[in-house]
């Protein structure tokens, strides 16, 4: 909950989930523009477009990441650079360690990777702008 988060949580989440991608991408865009090719995948989240209780700073940072992805798409499409916002739901990673949720409520990381590779494998004439992947049993 936003009102009970420790001081500095928002800054930490923005640093991890937005600024790191922002600065890395800025460092690579020049060469992508020169080559007139490239594909940027930004790891967003279901939290990028769906607010939920206890989402707090994490959700805020992921909303920002989706906005960043949309800006990049608009700015770079004329250079042949594709941009995909990847928005996975609950995926069985370390962030869910200790949860009581049964394993079938989660996607496998390999499923997300395969979906990303499928988007990457399209011809240069197509782009998956937003890749939304959810567990078969729905969001947690």
Which residues fall in each region the model found?
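Catalytic Tyr-X3-Lys loop
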Residues: 3-22, 37, 41, 65
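A short helix-coil junction within the Rossmann-fold of NAD(P)-dependent oxidoreductases
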Residues: 27-36
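Active-site loop immediately N-terminal to the catalytic Tyr-X3-Lys motif
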Residues: 3, 52-56
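Residue(s) in the substrate-gating loop at a strand-loop-helix junction
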Residues: 45
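Active-site-adjacent segment of SDR/Rossmann-fold oxidoreductases
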Residues: 32, 50, 71-81
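Active-site helix of classical SDR
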Residues: 25, 61
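Short, flexible catalytic-loop segment of classical short-chain dehydrogenase/reductase
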Residues: 88-98
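C-terminal helical subdomain
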Residues: 78-81, 85-86, 101-140
């Amino acid at each position: 909950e936003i009102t009970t988060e420790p001081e500095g949580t928002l800054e930490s989440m923005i640093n991890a989930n937005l600024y790191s991608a922002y600065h890395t991408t800025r460092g690579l865009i020049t060469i992508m523009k020169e080559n007139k090719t490239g594909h940027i995948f930004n790891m967003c989240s279901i939290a990028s477009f769906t607010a939920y209780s206890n989402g707090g700073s994490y959700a805020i940072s992921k909303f920002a990441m989706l906005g960043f992805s949309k800006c990049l798409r608009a700015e770079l499409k004329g250079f042949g650079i594709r941009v995909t916002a990847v928005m996975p739901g609950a995926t069985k990673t370390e962030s869910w360690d200790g949860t009581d949720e049964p394993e079938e409520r989660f996607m496998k990381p390999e499923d997300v990777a395969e979906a990303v590779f499928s988007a990457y494998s399209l011809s240069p004439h197509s782009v998956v702008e937003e890749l939304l992947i959810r567990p078969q049993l729905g969001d947690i």
